[in-house]
Amino acid sequence: MGSEKDSESPHSSVSGIPNPKCRGPGKKQGRISFHSLFHSKRGPRGSKANVGTPLAQQLHQQQQIQQQQLLQPPTPTNVSSDPSTADPAEPLSTSQASLGGQELLECPLCLVRQPAEQLPELQGCSHRSCLCCLRQYLRIEITESRVQLSCPECAERLAPWQVALILDDPNLMEKYEEFLLRRCLASDPDCRWCPAPDCGFAVIASGCASCPRLVCRREGCGAEFCYHCKQAWHPNQTCDSARQQRALSLRTHSNHSPSYTAEQGHTDDIKPCPRCGAYIIKMNDGSCNHMTCAVCGCEFCWLCMKEISDLHYLSPSGCTFWGKKPWSRKKKILWQLGTLIGAPVGITLIAGIAVPAMVIGIPVYIGRKIHSHYEGKKTSHHRRNLAITGGVALSIITAPVIAAVSVGIGVPIMLAYVYGVVPISLCRGGGCGVSRGKGRGVRIDFDEDDGPITVADAWRALKSPSLGESSLEGAASGLSTTSPSEGLSVAPGGLGDTPHFNTLAGGALGARTGKYSRLEVQGTELGKEVAGRETGSLGAASDCASTRGMAGSITSSYTLPDREGTNLEIQVDIETKPSHLCLTTEEDLAPPTAAMAPGVGEEPQDCSSRRSRTVMDSPLGLSPGMSLREGLRDVTLAQPESIRSDLEMSDTQSDDIAELTSDDCDSPHPKSCHGAPPQATCRALNPTDSLHCPDNVILYV
């Protein structure tokens, strides 16, 4: 009886030996384990067996998702009851750091774990990125002409051999080397690139400013271009007129082209770099005006097209950081006057506000910082309050000292900027418009500027070693000496109302003469050490010279109109080193007929052929003492030729002067300059004549 009662008691299910007579109670009191959720046996009651099935399926699906995320194959459904194999957390965590015994590193660019062999270590820094990301990075940089390559994570420069190893692309490497070469040649002022299409040949034209006709020596090219304007060669034409002609033809071609639309971008969006001349396109998207050339690395302002520093937009230059055009002259002058007048009031107001703000604001700021420092820490309230009180008390003592030092240093700096930097910056080069008239006091010019910088203006502003920087625009008569070599500009143009512009030795002169008018021009050129700037030319019937700025330009062939009683006198004084020009006295000059005809149909000559010639034939003659109405014209023009090298030059100079004068040349109607009948006094000199080379040449016509 006792054994039966014990077996029927509710505590019998806890015993180690199960009782077959008590199946029901033993089933109800059984323990629930994690293994039983997946492998539960169906009992006689189906309702109880179906309760744990959905929960088991959900847990099984979650486990499969985790396994797929960790890149592990799914485990089979029948999992053993061993707890060491039931939890796969430990083997999966170790697989993230190694794969087959190899160390995995995370790329900072694509955030993908890869073997260490795929992440090369760059020289100079400890950063590592995968090869795929590095190749894409270098490909983008080289395609956009950025050759100053650096590490993607720091500013450490990459060596060319590292770039070659990472790229492993001969075409990109060739382009990279070409961009490096262009960047290097951009610093050479005498480097000229061939303008022919599909030609990347460069010419180092050192000392060719006096003979600007250059020829590309690349095999199959042979293009001729100008040293000054860097465009196709334009014989008997100035650089400005050739540029205008090209612009006109391009505009005409664009208007008739079917692909031309009126919605194309403005020319103001494309400007050349002020250092290397590479064209740069600026998107009209509201970006800043601080530009950086990708070819030469020049930093310049898009509005004024000048190389700038970081303080350019803080100075009163009229250029704004975000604007589309610079300030007008009126706005700059008004801003200057307002600054000069209102500076004391503004500085006093700023100092009056800054002193109490610092005296009150510094203690408040210190107290808040100390309170936030102790807020998250487990410290006593007494210690925190003591630190806050001490910091505020110390800041109250030091705040007046800081305010006094700031005002004592800041106010003189602002006064020096307002009354020193602002006037100097605005009045530099006449930008302030303030001028002093004769007996009229100070005059302020409020005329507006010409407008924004265009492509043509930007090209004219390029720094070039050419001797000619003068413009041929306008019809004002006078002598322009804007070239660095102080050259001569002579223009015996039409003797009527229409001026003629011809450039010689670096300048431009528009001669406008009327009835009984007289023109006298005298120019001087000092000898320089540079061979290209030691030569002067006074016109020749050859097309072997650019007439832009023109040391070594030509005078175009023309016929003087028949004007009654008009005399023209030109005096030329050139001081230079001895050249191959040889002049004799007036008795040695014979009147050949060849000198009377203009040099038409001559073959163009390059620099070498130009230097080999000693005297160029004159295109026309103006006989001294003969009136133009009688149709007798004779001229004697001398042209010192280019000197080959500094070794062939002599430091001695001669004082010989060849003069062709007449006592009657000053009269409106000269009959003759000599007692004998007038004769032509100009002939082509023989290059073989061993005559003395003069230094000073004075010509009277």
Swiss-Prot record:
One example of a Gene Ontology biological process annotation: ubiquitin-dependent protein catabolic process
TM annotation in the entry: 340-360, 396-416
GO cellular component: cytoplasm; endoplasmic reticulum membrane; ubiquitin ligase complex
Low complexity compositional bias, start-end: 57-72
Protein's membrane topology: Multi-pass membrane protein
Pathway(s): Protein modification; protein ubiquitination
Location, primary (coarse class): membrane
Keyword terms, alphabetized: Endoplasmic reticulum, Membrane, Metal-binding, Repeat, Transferase, Transmembrane, Transmembrane helix, Ubl conjugation pathway, Zinc, Zinc-finger
Database matches in InterPro entries: E3_UB_ligase_RBR, IBR_dom, TRIAD_supradom, Znf_RING, Znf_RING/FYVE/PHD
Entry GO MF terms: ubiquitin conjugating enzyme binding; ubiquitin protein ligase activity; zinc ion binding
Domain-related comment: The first IBR-type zinc finger is the most crucial for interaction with UBE2L3, UBE2L6 and UCKL1.
Complexes and interactors: Interacts with UBE2L3, UBE2L6 and UCKL1.
Main function: E3 ubiquitin-protein ligase which accepts ubiquitin from E2 ubiquitin-conjugating enzymes UBE2L3 and UBE2L6 in the form of a thioester and then directly transfers the ubiquitin to targeted substrates, such as UCKL1. Involved in the cytolytic activity of natural killer cells and cytotoxic T-cells. Protects against staurosporin-induced cell death.
Protein family (similarity comment): Belongs to the RBR family. RNF19 subfamily.
Name listed for the protein in its UniProt record: E3 ubiquitin-protein ligase RNF19B
Organism of this sequence: Danio rerio (Zebrafish)
Gene name, Swiss-Prot/TrEMBL: rnf19b
